[in-house]
Amino acid sequence: MSTVDILSPAGEKTGSVELPAEIFGVEKISIPLIHQVVVAQNAAARQGTHKTKRRGEVRGGGKKPYRQKGTGRARQGSTRAPQFAGGGVVHGPQPRDYSQRTPKKMKAAALRHALTDRARHNRIHVVTGVIEGENPSTKAARTLFGKISERKNLLLVVDRADEAAWLSARNLPQIHILEPGQLNTYDVLVSDDVVFTQAAFESFVSGPNKAVDTEGSEA
């Protein structure tokens, strides 16, 4: 079980906390599992409202454009056939549901594997708070994040009730804010570092993500 330092809003070490092995210490990270869950998550985010009109849905074209024989041209029955300009679209996209069925255990396991990868590369951080006091300060939040990591994309996990942290960090570019219950595999992977407030960290590790992988190793 590894440990990480707990930093104050000023960036100073105030203590340390252990990263539970069942969440941050998976023995073997499964890339196919992570890939499957991320693909499913991105697919579920698609609206699927794309729509083209078939020849039967396009307005007009009810009259035969010219007689069947004697013109020397190919026979045509409607000017709304796919080969005509203004005609219907053949095999075009239609509204559909792109979502895939992904078991909850699979989602939770993929998240643990992603967090393990970040923990192995020392990219999990815990802070007592984003700012000192209750007055929001974007400047103070920017200074803290600069001390935590030189990398740009940070995922900040804060408690729902920590309004000062939300207001301080929400306008910072490349800072994505989530609650502990919203933490997911995709957002962990697209972020360089994951920063927990201490309250959010305690809430997350005591939640439903504390489980055992089906392969037999703890995750």
From Swiss-Prot:
Any GO BP: translation
Pfam families: Ribosomal_L4
Residue ranges of the region described as Disordered: 43-101
Compositional bias per record (Basic residues), positions renumbered to this chain: 61-72
InterPro entries: Ribosomal_uL4 (IPR002136), Ribosomal_uL4-like (IPR013005), Ribosomal_uL4_dom_sf (IPR023574)
GO CC, one annotated term: ribonucleoprotein complex
Nucleotide-binding listed as a keyword: no
Recorded GO MF terms: rRNA binding; structural constituent of ribosome
Keyword check for rRNA-binding: yes
Keywords, ordered alphabetically: Ribonucleoprotein, Ribosomal protein, RNA-binding, rRNA-binding
HAMAP family: Ribosomal_uL4_B (MF_01328_B)
Subunit-level organization: Part of the 50S ribosomal subunit.
Function of the protein: One of the primary rRNA binding proteins, this protein initially binds near the 5'-end of the 23S rRNA. It is important during the early stages of 50S assembly. It makes multiple contacts with different domains of the 23S rRNA in the assembled 50S subunit and ribosome.
Family to which the UniProt record says this protein belongs: Belongs to the universal ribosomal protein uL4 family.
Name of this chain's protein: Large ribosomal subunit protein uL4
